[in-house]
A protein has these predicted regions:
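Short glycine/proline- and aromatic-enriched beta-strand/turn motifs that initiate or cap beta-hairpins
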Residues: 16-80, 293-295, 300, 306-308
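Transmembrane beta-barrel strands of outer-membrane/channel proteins
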Residues: 20-26, 65-71, 135-143, 204-212, ...
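Outer-membrane beta-barrel translocator domains and adjoining extracellular loop/strand segments
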Residues: 28-39, 73-86, 144-159, 213-225, ...
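Extracellular loop and loop/strand-boundary signature of outer-membrane beta-barrel proteins
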Residues: 32-39, 98-107, 169-178, 215-230, ...
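Residues that define the transmembrane beta-barrel architecture of outer-membrane proteins
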Residues: 41-47, 108-114, 131, 180-186, ...
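Residues on the lipid-exposed face of transmembrane beta-strands in outer-membrane beta-barrel proteins
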Residues: 49-53, 114-122, 137-139, 186-194, ...
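Short loop/turn motifs that connect adjacent beta-strands in outer-membrane beta-barrel proteins
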Residues: 54-63, 122-133, 195-202, 242-259
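Predominantly the C-terminal beta-signal and adjacent terminal strand-loop region
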Residues: 228-309
């Protein structure tokens, strides 16, 4: 992880332009994983170093990058599946005032998302007016801290632990645990900017990629291979207070300070999870009819400041 961060910082320092963005929005997680029985969401903060588009030595070849750190607040969800089973058990309770149930779970998501884009400008009038087609290569390293959000009373869960071995095992999985995710993505990308006047431009960026990697949980010592699709849409306004060009012989530079306001939506759908049990690999596609498909999406509004020369 430290080597990855150091490499990203080095690339940023060597770049002729960079932008810092702060964003705030929502994060949603869906699917039959980690005890989820539906969809849960929370507010998130994002911190990004970015350069959307920079031409190489005045050519039509361009590159861009964005490195984003995300931190969510706590997501909570009741364990409805298991509590439904408990409701049935309560029917046999001679003292119906007692309620035996598994408490809700807390989830907190953090992580790094890094993307590099390279491509060719099919339209390149200047740095404020271009249309580029390229390739996205990236990786995502989030992790999910999860734990039960309350300690059940002896009168509630203890009966089921003592009398239902399967439920006892499931309850043990709801202790504090960390789920690490490492994925790689590659796919086509489009990048454009169009000036509205001398100081304001509108820009957009879209990507659709194949994403593959693994999900690992430390508590149950499990590791799942995952395959899916990633998509991202980013639109915004670009503001610069001045645009001047300075020439010294053959050298020409156009230093700028600028600001951005934008909106970014990204989504990762896990189409298949390969679960290896005792040497036998099972595909999660058999769970699709049960609506247990895993997915993540985020919507973020952001503001940024940057420079270029």
């Amino acid at each position: 992880m430290k080597k990855i961060v150091l490499s990203l910082v080095t690339l940023t320092l060597l770049s002729s332009a960079t932008e810092f963005q702060y964003g705030s929005g929502t994060f949603n997680m869906t699917g039959g994983f980690l005890g989820l029985t539906g969809s849960v969401g929370t507010d998130i903060d994002t911190f990004t170093l970015s350069e959307r588009h920079s031409n190489v030595a005045g050519s039509d070849i361009f590159y861009g990058y964005d490195f984003t750190w995300m931190d969510s607040k706590t997501l909570k969800q009741a364990q409805h599946t298991y509590n439904d089973m408990v409701t049935v058990a309560n029917g046999f309770n001679p003292m119906p005032t007692n309620k035996w149930e598994i408490p809700s779970m807390d989830y907190r998501v953090k992580g790094l998302d890094a993307n590099i884009r390279v491509g060719y400008d099919v339209v390149n009038e200047n740095q404020d007016n271009f249309l580029g087609l390229g390739l996205l290569i990236g990786l995502s390293i989030p992790w999910i801290d999860s734990s039960s959000s309350a300690v059940p009373s002896d009168d509630s869960i203890q009966f089921i632990i003592d009398n239902r071995e399967n439920l006892a095992t499931a309850y043990d999985y709801f202790e504090k645990t960390k789920t690490s995710i490492m994925t790689y993505k590659i796919g086509p990308s489009i990048n454009f900017q169009k000036s509205l006047n001398e100081n304001i431009s509108i820009y957009g960026l879209g990507s659709f990629a194949y994403q593959t990697g693994y999900i690992k949980n430390d508590h149950i010592d499990s590791k799942f291979s995952v395959n899916g699709t990633y998509q991202e849409y980013n639109v915004g306004f670009y503001f610069t207070p001045f645009t001047e060009t300075y020439k010294w012989g053959w050298l020409s530079i156009s230093p700028r300070l600028y600001g951005t306001l934008g909106y970014k939506y990204s989504k990762w759908d896990v189409d298949e999870m390969l679960i290896n049990t005792s040497g036998v690999e099972m595909s999660s596609k058999i769970l699709d009819p049960l609506g247990m498909k895993l997915g993540f999406d985020s919507s973020v509004a952001y503001a940024g400041v940057g420079y270029s020369f």
